[in-house]
């Protein structure tokens, strides 16, 4: 498949699937914002805008307006954002030097105890000087520099390699902890309520940055909940904040601009708790493009898998060169007790910080608003309940909804009881609230109709032991991978449920202003910075490792998870639950570099011309460079087959020793009935650091279910280098 055909297929699918959304950027003349991606940066980056202008003049002629070029990408790769008609975009796509042209899309945010739960206590050994020279780039909603998590006491000046800058608008100041801050808002006005510059008034970016690299703050809590010492995975590391997300979302144009700067500024790792609603192919995906060029410069991107679960095919974090992170539970769970007037108590879930008080109790079905009946008001949907009849009462709603949904319609209520079959994570709400099991809510309704003056108390949340943890949470997006079905995604799982971290004092908590320094929220947005912090910690001990080597270390040392709790198996949790300390000394790694990804791209339909534009070198797709997906040196093994089809597939891999001493590893296979898995050779001897050995894994058999899991472990008796083998009929 040629690169131009790839463009045309994705151009039209993207255009029609996003026609309605793209109107947000559309002018009256039918022009929309497009990104023209042209691969590696020019040798003379300062000439990029002249080159781009010449291209546009060829297409639009005398009607060309310089202001239509919204942004030029030139520091780390080559491209521009521009307003075009559909016809103009097609013409540019066919021009020499263009890799892809795609509509600008809005991405979305994927929104303590966690580190101890991971076996990563405050007392772990650290290479303090190395950690202090590492810069974590966070692409998010900005940052709140006044948070105690970003105090720079004891920090030396920024490392000499740092080339970034600090925007100082709206009284924003960097320090020796936050050493860089930029903001991007290309091609559209600032939304009402947004603050120009890198200051975070949403909270999301402050929370993720402090989870990855925040300093130690004792007595951190949310109104008494989660009390303890807040800290990031690498508290001595520096932070560079790139604000790409605003009230209207996270634009492709802004994400690419941030990558362009972050790579050139000198960040060492990128944390990106953002993603698209729909999967896209690699070079019509801003995150895939940015992270590819980051890998070229030795920079790993940790990216949230998304919050679209629990169904299959919901993750949009698909690129093999980035680390896709699922969210899992930890052993602390917040619960909110409810006691009704007859003395019965029920355990619900929420983050409820409000004081305990007894209030009258009413069912939403009994107080329908004008124009509604009880069949609608029972669910408390928007404006369906009578505001005059709920004042000062706890309302029972036979549904559940997020912190910002419908609560304006419940203004004046004293509290809300909701219900859901899925209660594996807790939210904050603007009123005393608890989400009950459906049977407990039914018992509450029976009580209401058994007495003249029913009432209830919603107690402040407490914590209980969650013995089943870690389990991938229901909202975490799942694979398989829609772009390349035999590359397993997500890659790994980390804590993403009910995470306490820093928060701007001006940002809302549960939909209302609470003036707190910390907040408890859930999402793959929260698991992503945990993995960022751990990857950075691994890098402090192994500073010369490639992004792929760090990724391999995390994946092959991850703790296996139980498919009984997550029937989607590896498509829920990837290689398993992260194990920070084991990842520092994995023994062996599956390494990969740019040339490996070029071979992979050749196998995905990109031709020599396309890959040369992307890489800026003499890479080529040849008959001997087929780029079989099963030969990409990936730390997991994926195979998609037809149901009941007999298959016989082989995978080629190469392992690199990262231990100084000689060692011998033996292969151990775990496979269910119906699968025959062999490894040749099944014993590998390494002479020491950097020695490489290759092997072939062959899988034969047939499967009856949707997902069948097996595993390969290489062990020398000390290290256990584990890779999942996942066969699926979900094609």
From Swiss-Prot:
GO terms for biological process: proteolysis. Keywords: Allergen, Autocatalytic cleavage, Disulfide bond, Glycoprotein, Hydrolase, Protease, Secreted, Serine protease, Signal, Zymogen. The C-terminal propeptide is autocleaved. One of its GO terms (molecular function) is serine-type endopeptidase activity. Coiled coil: none annotated. Residues 1-22 form the signal peptide. Glycans are attached at residues 466, 652. Melting point at 81 degrees Celsius. This is Cucumisin.
């Amino acid at each position: 498949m040629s690169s131009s055909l790839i463009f045309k297929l994705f151009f039209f699918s993207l255009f029609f699937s996003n026609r309605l959304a793209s109107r947000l950027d559309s002018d009256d003349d039918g022009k929309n914002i497009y990104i023209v991606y042209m691969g590696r940066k020019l040798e003379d980056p300062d000439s990029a805008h002249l080159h781009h202008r010449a291209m546009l003049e060829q297409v639009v002629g005398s009607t060309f307006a310089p202001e239509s070029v919204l942004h030029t990408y030139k520091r780390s790769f080559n491209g521009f954002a521009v307003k075009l008609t559909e016809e103009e975009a097609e013409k540019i796509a066919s021009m020499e030097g263009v890799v892809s042209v795609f509509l600008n899309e809005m991405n979305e945010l994927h929104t303590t105890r966690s580190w101890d739960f991971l076996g990563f206590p405050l007392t772990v050994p650290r290479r303090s000087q190395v950690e202090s020279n590492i810069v974590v780039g966070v692409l998010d909603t900005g940052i709140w520099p006044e948070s105690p998590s970003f105090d720079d006491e004891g920090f030396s000046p920024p490392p000499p390699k740092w080339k970034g800058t600090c925007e100082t608008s709206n009284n924003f100041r960097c320090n020796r902890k936050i050493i860089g801050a930029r903001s991007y808002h290309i091609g559209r006005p600032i939304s009402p309520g947004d603050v120009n510059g890198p200051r975070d008034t949403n909270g999301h970016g402050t929370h993720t940055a402090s989870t990855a690299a925040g300093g130690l703050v004792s007595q951190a809590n949310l109104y008494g909940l989660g009390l303890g010492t807040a800290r990031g995975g690498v508290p001595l590391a520096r932070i560079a904040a790139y604000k790409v997300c605003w009230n209207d979302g996270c634009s492709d144009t802004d994400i690419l601009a941030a990558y362009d700067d972050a790579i050139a500024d000198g960040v060492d790792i990128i944390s990106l708790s953002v993603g698209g609603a729909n999967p896209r192919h690699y070079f019509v995906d801003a995150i895939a493009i940015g992270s590819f060029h980051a890998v070229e410069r030795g920079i790993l991107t940790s990216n949230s898998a998304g919050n679209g679960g629990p169904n299959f095919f919901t993750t949009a974090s698909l690129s093999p060169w980035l680390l896709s992170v699922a969210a899992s539970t930890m052993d602390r769970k917040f619960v909110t007790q409810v006691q009704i007037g007859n003395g019965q108590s029920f355990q619900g879930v929420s983050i409820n910080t409000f004081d305990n008080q007894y209030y009258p109790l009413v069912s939403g079905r009994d107080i329908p608003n004008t124009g509604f009946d009880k069949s609608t008001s029972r669910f408390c949907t928007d404006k369906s309940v009578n505001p005059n009849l709920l004042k000062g009462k706890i309302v029972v709603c036979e549904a559940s909804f997020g912190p910002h949904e419908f609560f304006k319609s419940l203004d004046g209520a004293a509290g809300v009881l909701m219900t859901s079959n899925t209660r594996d994570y807790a939210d904050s709400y603007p009123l005393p609230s608890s989400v009950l099991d459906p049977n407990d809510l039914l018992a509450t309704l029976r009580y209401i109709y058994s007495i003249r003056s029913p009432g209830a108390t919603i107690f402040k949340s407490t914590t209980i032991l969650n013995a089943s943890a870690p389990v991938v949470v229901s909202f975490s997006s799942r694979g398989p991978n829609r772009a390349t079905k035999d590359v397993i995604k997500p890659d790994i799982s980390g804590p993403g449920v009910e995470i306490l971290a820093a928060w701007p004092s001006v940002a809302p908590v549960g939909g209302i202003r609470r003036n707190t320094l910390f907040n408890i929220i859930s999402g793959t947005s929260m698991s992503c910075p945990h993995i960022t912090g751990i990857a950075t910690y691994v890098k402090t001990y192994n500073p010369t490792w490639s992004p792929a080597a760090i990724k391999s270390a995390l994946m092959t040392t991850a703790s296996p998870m139980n498919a009984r709790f997550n029937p989607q198996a590896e498509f829920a949790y990837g290689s398993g639950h992260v194990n920070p300390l084991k990842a520092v000394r994995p023994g062996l790694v599956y390494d990969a570099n740019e040339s490996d990804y070029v071979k992979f791209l050749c196998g995905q339909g990109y031709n020599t011309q396309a890959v040369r534009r992307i890489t800026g070198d003499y890479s080529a797709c040849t008959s001997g460079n087929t780029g079989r997906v099963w030969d990409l040196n990936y730390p997991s093994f994926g195979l998609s087959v037809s149901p009941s089809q007999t298959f016989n597939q082989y995978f080629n891999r190469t392992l690199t020793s990262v231990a100084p001493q000689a060692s011998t590893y033996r292969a151990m296979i775990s496979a269910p009935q119906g699968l025959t898995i062999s490894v040749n050779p099944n014993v590998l001897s390494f002479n020491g650091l950097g020695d490489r050995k290759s092997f072939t894994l062959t899988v034969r058999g047939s499967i009856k279910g949707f997902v069948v899991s097996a595993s390969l472990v290489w062990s020398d008796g000390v290290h256990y280098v584990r890779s999942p083998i996942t066969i699926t009929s979900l094609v």
